[in-house]
Amino acid sequence: MKFLSEDFLLNNENAKLLFHKHAEKMPIIDYHCHLEQEEIYENKKYENLTQIWLGGDHYKWRLLRANGIPEKLITGDGDDYEKFLAFAKTLEKSLGNPIYEWTHLELKRFFHIDKLISSETAKEIWDEANQMLATDDFRPRALIKNSNVKVVCTTDAPVSKLSYHKSLAKEEKDFKVLPALRPDHLISITDGHFAEYLTELSAVSGIKIKDFKTMIKALEQRFEFFTSLGGRLSDHSLSTYTFAETDDVDLDSIIQRAKEKQTLTDLEYNQYITALILEIMKLNKKFDWTMQLHVNVNRSINGPALRKIGENTGFDSMGTQANISEELTKLFSKAAELEIIPKTILYSLNQNDWLELATLIGCFQGEGVQQLQLGAGWWFNDTAKGMEKQLEIFASQSLLPNFVGMLTDSRSFLSYPRHEYFRRVLCNFVGQLIESGRIPDDEALVGKMIEDISYNNVHDYFGFFKNEDSKQ
């Protein structure tokens, strides 16, 4: 098969039919990404391919480092063309890596350039693409609109004033840009900045934070504020997690000691995190939001690189906490007793957790359709094999037709072809089930499932259009 042909990843006739007739043209809701609200609002043109393609993309940075490229041409102040040339040389060696496929797919879909990126073609592609980047069709909002994206959910700190979201809500009519709340600094209470962060949260919420109860009250005010601007999700990174009973625990003392930068015991930290997550579950339930939990990841494990370059620069790895599903089971058992389990999507960076998590969510579904979901293959699992394995586990342990599907988790405006990539994997997976006689060769039945996973489920699950739908 030709590289990136119209049928790439589609290995049977049913897969081809399902993709081209039922998946390809469905709109996109990107419910978890790391685009900056300011960049969407300001809608500035990018000067060149390096700025739009390599800036902030730690997936690509990891490959560049593996190819011996100096940091000056990765995150440093090197010349933009030299950075792109270094990437082109690296991409030649990335055969078999999904970045090779994504990058060429993005080049083909956005720039209509059907050439292989290499050191020989770099200058030609650079010049041709940069000419297009100078046009209005390559401003951020046009890229979103022309990708048939209906909703973009950014990732925002509770203290964010969401000023650009407010402006976009008034001005942008072709798609929604909605905030998703991620209170990292309330979780990272041992990083030495907890006191300053509580001061900031107090100021923006208008609530004086003097103990755990008032801290949660301030957080609730931010849930209300985010809701007023269309917010429907929270997101939480738990690199590791150990459940701890919180009854009769002096949480106020733990907070005070963290503010004073005193050392907390592991038990105290686990008690605080458990209490915090339970309160966050309660708030998600109250506001009819969806809680996302990203677990089992080792972040910024290269200390010198962290100090020199900073966070989110490509020095993270898969976590190996073997009992994290067991600890989450204790958390959900406690939440069930309190009747505070919200809609939840669970992601783990370690595939060994997926089957355990899939069986866990089956124990706590509650009322409503697929209230708990096993999240799409995340980060290092964002590959054809990773996507297929997640689909297989979801289908075998729950109801695949209820799955809310793909997200980009990206910092790039050119990443939307990842939805196409996922849909191709989905259609091929389902096509194989038909070919092997495991599900009916019924286009109406199976085609609807493909359309639902591609768009309809995520539309209904999060309720981004609830007000508009109720008026129809």
UniProtKB/Swiss-Prot annotation:
It is an enzyme of class 5 (isomerase). Pathway: Carbohydrate metabolism; pentose and glucuronate interconversion. Keywords: Isomerase. InterPro entries: Metal_Hydrolase (IPR032466), Uronate_isomerase (IPR003766). The keyword Repressor does not apply. One of its GO terms (biological process) is D-galacturonate catabolic process. It catalyses: D-glucuronate = D-fructuronate; aldehydo-D-galacturonate = keto-D-tagaturonate. Pfam families: UxaC. The keyword Isomerase applies. It comes from the Bacteria. GO terms for molecular function: glucuronate isomerase activity. Its EC number is 5.3.1.12. Belongs to the metallo-dependent hydrolases superfamily. Uronate isomerase family. PANTHER family: URONATE ISOMERASE. HAMAP family: UxaC (MF_00675). This is Uronate isomerase. It comes from Lactococcus lactis subsp. cremoris (strain SK11). The lineage of its organism: Bacteria, Bacillati, Bacillota, Bacilli, Lactobacillales.
